[in-house]
Amino acid sequence: MANHKSALKRIRSNEKKRVLNRYQHKTTRNAIKALRIATDKTEATAKLSNVISMIDKLAKKNIIHDNKASNLKSKLTRFVSSL
């Protein structure tokens, strides 16, 4: 266990960030799954812009890598256009 006040604070702040990052990542994954099971093109197109925005936010906060974000956006866009 840490002995310094700053180390204790760092442990607390890291835990808060970890919980928030996990929530945001899980929410995005659920939105991606919902998009992939969509069968209607208009519904999927509406969901796509929301999902792409969520992916961009994760990449901006370094929760996921920029290249992974690009690959996900590309795959999802191709999926929606193929409907």
Curated annotation (Swiss-Prot):
Pfam families in the cross-refs: Ribosomal_S20p (PF01649)
One Gene Ontology term, aspect cellular component: small ribosomal subunit
Any GO BP annotation: translation
InterPro entries registered for this protein in UniProt: Ribosomal_bS20 (IPR002583), Ribosomal_bS20_sf (IPR036510)
Key words, A-Z: Ribonucleoprotein, Ribosomal protein, RNA-binding, rRNA-binding
SUPFAM superfamilies: Ribosomal protein S20
Gene3D superfamilies per record: Ribosomal protein S20
Source domain of life: Bacteria
GO molecular function: small ribosomal subunit rRNA binding; structural constituent of ribosome
Family to which this protein belongs: Belongs to the bacterial ribosomal protein bS20 family.
Function recorded in the entry: Binds directly to 16S ribosomal RNA.
Protein name in UniProt: Small ribosomal subunit protein bS20
Source species: Flavobacterium psychrophilum (strain ATCC 49511 / DSM 21280 / CIP 103535 / JIP02/86)
